[in-house]
Regions:
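Conserved TIR/SEFIR loop-to-helix hotspot centered on a Trp-containing motif
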Residues: 109-227
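C-terminal helicase lobe and adjacent C-terminal extensions/tails of nucleic-acid helicase motors
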Residues: 87-108
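A general structural signal for short secondary-structure boundary/capping elements
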Residues: 76-78, 89-93, 117-120
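Residue-identity detector for glutamine
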Residues: 12, 33, 42, 79, ...
């Protein structure tokens, strides 16, 4: 082992990264020289996703390794913000894990191509496979970017719908949207003649779900003027 007994995990990570660069990216050789297995090397290197403020806090023993492992998957600016709260309120590791899990987005709910998420530092799969502390596998820890990708996918789905309907509305949970479905028959039936007229109305259209669990679901034949 090349490190002092009191070397912090971050200092080990930084030293390992330098040795890995010297070895031209050969992780097996680097791990061998450090007296580690490759998993231990990968675990340490993943800590380098921590923002400088988080690294310093871990070096100074103001946070635990578990805190740093959980923060490593967040965008750097969010790491800084969350770190301040962790230190100020002495937030335990388990509480932080629960809080971060509430903001993460499930990749299984995504309607965009998640192939781009493989290897992303914000994909919790990396932390789940290597760290003792993580929010679990299959989550995006960069919710604003996830939302951007979701909206881009929804916009793409809306293009052909706009050729069919005067109104195409994205529906979010906070909208409290209650659709008014119209048709020629059924409980809200208006008759064939009126329904034909409705389809030409500027308030006739469809909704496209922007809500987790139903992303991309389309509800057609809606009236957006219930007055």
């Amino acid at each position: 082992n090349h490190f002092r007994d009191d070397t912090s995990d971050v200092e080990q990570a930084e030293g390992a990264a330098s040795l890995l660069a010297y070895n031209k990216g050969d992780k097996h050789e680097t791990a061998l020289q450090l007296g580690w297995n490759v998993d231990t090397l990968e675990r340490r290197l993943l800590l380098l996703n921590c923002a400088p403020t988080v690294r310093s806090a871990l070096n100074e023993r103001r946070i635990k390794l578990g805190h740093a492992e959980l923060l490593a998957g967040l965008p750097a600016n969010r790491q800084d913000k969350v770190l301040g709260g962790v230190i100020e309120h002495k937030v335990p590791v388990e509480v932080l894990k629960k809080q971060l899990g509430q903001f993460a987005k499930r990749l299984s709910d995504a309607i965009f191509d998640t192939a781009q998420c493989i290897g992303c530092p914000h994909n919790s799969a990396q932390q789940a496979s290597l760290f003792d502390e993580s929010i679990g596998d299959g989550f995006c820890q960069h919710p604003s970017h996830y939302d951007e990708l979701t909206m881009a996918a929804l916009e793409a789905r809306a293009v052909p719908l706009r050729d069919q309907f005067p109104v195409v509305r994205f529906v979010r949970l906070e909208d409290g949207f209650a659709p008014l479905t119209v048709g020629p028959d059924g409980p809200m039936g208006v008759g064939a003649t009126q329904y034909t007229a409705c389809k030409g109305c500027e308030n006739f259209g469809c909704s496209l779900s922007a809500m987790a669990g139903s992303y991309g679901e389309v509800h057609e034949s809606l009236c957006f003027d219930a007055a």
